[in-house]
Each structure stands twice: as C-alpha cells, then as structure tokens.
Amino acid sequence: MKQKIILWIGALLLLTAGTGCEKNKDYEVPTQLTGTRWELAGIVDAKTGKITPLAPKGCYGFKFISETEAKGGTVLNQMTVHLTTPPFIGIVTMIGDEENGDAALFYRIIKTLESYTWEKNELKFFYDNKQYYLLYKYSKP
C-alpha cells in the first residue's frame, strides 16, 4: 500500500511539473499590427536561409499607424508601407542618400516586391519570384 501511495504521489508530481513547463519565448508576438514597430534584419535567401544585413544597421524601420499602413524611414528619407497585394513600400522624401550604406540596394528591392507574410514576430516582403525577401523583426517599443 505504501508503495502505491509513493507511486501515485510521484506520478502526480511529474504530471503537474510537466504541464507547467512551456518554452520561454525570447520575443513577444504582436496580436495586431497597429502601433507595432519593425526593424529590418536583412535580406534573406529563401533557399539557404542566409541573412545579409543592410548597412547602416537600424536605418530601415517603420511603425504601423493602422493594420495596413506604416510610416518609417531609411538613412535620410521617410517611407510609407502599405500591406496590399502586392505590398508597397514607397519613399516619401527623396534626399540623395543612395551613397549611404546599402540604401541604393534597398530602393531597388522595394520597387520589385511581390508579396508579404506576417508570422509571429516576423514580417517578410518577397521579391525575385520569392527567391529572396526583406526580413523585418518586431521591435519592442
């Protein structure tokens, strides 16, 4: 009888310990886009998963003002983002910052966007027949 009680207590402890264990997330997952901020992590090769960051770091971000529209900036310019099909990222001001880091490359890419996806803390803008995408990561305010 004593052995059964110990077995039941052990099973109960394992059961309660197992249900309380959830992997800790090292990021937050936004439930809506309005008010969220996103920073460019880089260009991703969809086949290999290799990320190539764009310079200067931290200069290609935006914040959503509605569920489908965001405002942000590049090195020197302001930009708008519209989650349409296809998505649209447009440069509002046109100050010549194409010599700054990878701004010229960024400007070429945003003219060719085909689609986008939003999954958890990642926003992906695909181009070149979905072979590459701009990877944006959710940034805590």
From Swiss-Prot:
It is found in: Cell membrane. Keywords: Cell membrane, Lipoprotein, Membrane, Palmitate, Signal. Its main location: membrane. It is a lipid-anchor. A lipid is attached at C21 (S-diacylglycerol cysteine). Residues 1-20 form the signal peptide. GO terms for cellular component: plasma membrane. A lipid is attached at C21 (N-palmitoyl cysteine). This is Putative lipoprotein Tanf_09445. It comes from Tannerella forsythia (strain ATCC 43037 / JCM 10827 / CCUG 21028 A / KCTC 5666 / FDC 338).
